[in-house]
Regions:
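The first (N-terminal) embedded transmembrane alpha-helix
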Residues: 25-46
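Membrane-interface helix termini and inter-helical loops of multi-pass transporters
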Residues: 45-55, 84-87, 115-116
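Loop-to-helix transition at the N-terminal end of transmembrane alpha-helices
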Residues: 52-69, 92-93, 203
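Membrane-water interface of transmembrane alpha-helices
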Residues: 69-81
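Juxtamembrane helix-capping/reentrant segments at transmembrane boundaries
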Residues: 85-101
Length: 217
């Protein structure tokens, strides 16, 4: 009896740690943050690092405002207005307004970056994120696609495309991004936010959109 209780207590502790870890991974690799991280990587590892520090900072602040701050603010207002929790907002039929807010914000950012003549390969990051949002919104009526999985897949697809454009060996980075994508999908599955089918479709949409936008823009 004592051993059984001890085993149950350890099992509950293990499950709680697993859920907590999944929540942290899900938060750190939110689809809202990935465009900012990708843009920052371009400012460091491409010829854009020759820009003045103030210019790079202003570009990052601009991207942050339109991909994180504004969407989060308006989605928060929408959720509070309806009295929903984050989990309740995640229901498939309630995701259209958050999608519309994100798409409008990303489209505005894309227009601004085009207006200030940002290089095409940098525009491709925002275009990829925008196209992922659009495709996920279109298929939302039939399938609750995971935007976390789609965003992580977009990073993988974009990396493959940049490897072709700049002719570098992406093996190490590709392994890392695939591993991170797997971590994100596992976290969403553990939290019971999505099924394996929804996660798989999300990754597939992300890879295709990320790759095509970088190649063709």
């Amino acid at each position: 009896m004592f051993l059984q209780r001890l085993f149950q207590a350890r099992s509950r502790r293990s499950v709680s740690w697993l859920v907590l870890t999944s929540q942290v991974v899900s938060l750190l690799f939110s689809p809202f943050y990935l465009p900012v991280i990708a843009f920052a990587a371009l400012l460091v590892f491409s010829y854009l690092n020759m820009l003045p520090l103030l210019t790079k900072a202003l570009l990052l602040v601009l991207v942050y405002c339109f991909t994180i701050a504004l969407p989060h603010f308006f989605i928060f207002l929408y959720r509070k207005f309806n009295g929903w929790t984050r989990h309740q907002l995640g229901r498939r039929e309630r995701r259209y307004v958050p999608y519309a807010v994100s798409i409008a914000s990303y489209a505005s950012l894309f227009y601004i970056l085009v207006s200030i003549h940002v290089p095409r390969f940098a525009l491709a990051i925002i275009a990829g994120a925008l196209s992922i949002q659009v495709v996920c919104a279109l298929v939302n009526s039939r399938l609750k696609v995971s935007t976390h999985a789609a965003a992580s897949g977009g990073v993988v697809g974009s990396l493959m495309a940049f490897a072709l454009i700049f002719s570098f060996d992406p093996t190490g980075w590709l392994c890392l991004t695939v591993l991170l994508s797997g971590m994100v999908c596992t976290a969403r599955f553990v939290l019971r936010q999505h099924t394996l089918r929804e996660l798989g479709w999300g990754v597939a949409i992300g890879v295709v959109c990320g790759f095509c936008c970088v190649i063709f823009i």
